[in-house]
Amino acid sequence: MIKVVPKVLVMSGYGINCETETAHTFQKAGAKTDIVHINDLIAGKKKMADYEIIMFPGGFSYGDDTGSGNAFANKIKNNLFDDLKEFINSGKLILGICNGFQVMTNLGLFALPSTDYGERISALEANTNNRYECRWVHIKENESICVFTKGIDIIHVPIAHGEGRFYCDEKTYLELKENKQIVFTYCDSEGNPANKEYPLNPNGAYYDIAGICDKSGRIMGLMPHPERSLYSISEPEYQLKKEIAKRNGEIIPEFIESNIQIFKNAVEYFNK
């Protein structure tokens, strides 16, 4: 059987700054990528319908003015939302990381069984300590319905945000939990819950939530950056792990497999 190579539309423009490493990671996972400025979509030079995956990368779109991800989301709502809903209804995939998660949250893309796309169900607010957090954390997959996380358990991954505290009301939380839409939660290195304790939970997120998906499992957003931790050499403990592996006659793999697996799963979705 001929392997399908999905095309990824990597959004760009106005303060987004992770498009290059995000495109690189998707390429390593087996996809083709185009980095596309939002104005080119609005002008009709590129079309969402020509792609299988839309990627909202990290960064600080519009300098986080009016709230992180809000201005960029409004630009999409005012110009491209019909195209985006058509893309969703066609059964394709959308992924958002950090600022991308914030944009998608403001767009209302994480629909519940009781809601429709365009209805906002949650927020990503200022970190509890009112500080920008830039370091590595552990997150655990929660046996969700998400297509991006097949075969993933615990991930060691960097964060870089000042507004990452997930919040929703209790009714929404219970529906997310019931429908297995809570994808990632903050934890310790063994997978034990952070229980909202700092520094395991870096931002005070409600129920330690680091990432969620929509009711179909095809749309996911998360605050941590797996695309920034593609290679083993990027890990803080790399030199120690390298020395231990050397003494044991082993070689450290090039990639952090759990992190690239998110992107491989997206590619494999179109080869089922």
From Swiss-Prot:
Its main location: cytoplasm. Pathway: Purine metabolism; IMP biosynthesis via de novo pathway; 5-amino-1-(5-phospho-D-ribosyl)imidazole from N(2)-formyl-N(1)-(5-phospho-D-ribosyl)glycinamide: step 1/2. It comes from the Archaea. InterPro entries: Class_I_gatase-like, PRibForGlyAmidine_synth_PurQ. GO terms for biological process: 'de novo' IMP biosynthetic process. It catalyses: N(2)-formyl-N(1)-(5-phospho-beta-D-ribosyl)glycinamide + L-glutamine + ATP + H2O = 2-formamido-N(1)-(5-O-phospho-beta-D-ribosyl)acetamidine + L-glutamate + ADP + phosphate + H(+); L-glutamine + H2O = L-glutamate + NH4(+). Pfam families: GATase_5 (PF13507). CDD domains: GATase1_FGAR_AT. The active site is at C98, H225, E227, E235. Keywords: ATP-binding, Cytoplasm, Glutamine amidotransferase, Hydrolase, Ligase, Nucleotide-binding, Purine biosynthesis. Its EC number is 6.3.5.3, 3.5.1.2. It is found in: Cytoplasm. One of its GO terms (molecular function) is glutaminase activity. One of its GO terms (cellular component) is cytoplasm. Residues 8-243 form the Glutamine amidotransferase type-1 domain. Part of the FGAM synthase complex composed of 1 PurL, 1 PurQ and 2 PurS subunits. PANTHER family: PHOSPHORIBOSYLFORMYLGLYCINAMIDINE SYNTHASE (PTHR10099:SF1). Part of the phosphoribosylformylglycinamidine synthase complex involved in the purines biosynthetic pathway. Catalyzes the ATP-dependent conversion of formylglycinamide ribonucleotide (FGAR) and glutamine to yield formylglycinamidine ribonucleotide (FGAM) and glutamate. The FGAM synthase complex is composed of three subunits. PurQ produces an ammonia molecule by converting glutamine to glutamate. PurL transfers the ammonia molecule to FGAR to form FGAM in an ATP-dependent manner. This is Phosphoribosylformylglycinamidine synthase subunit PurQ. The lineage of its organism: Archaea, Methanobacteriati, Methanobacteriota, Methanomada group, Methanococci.
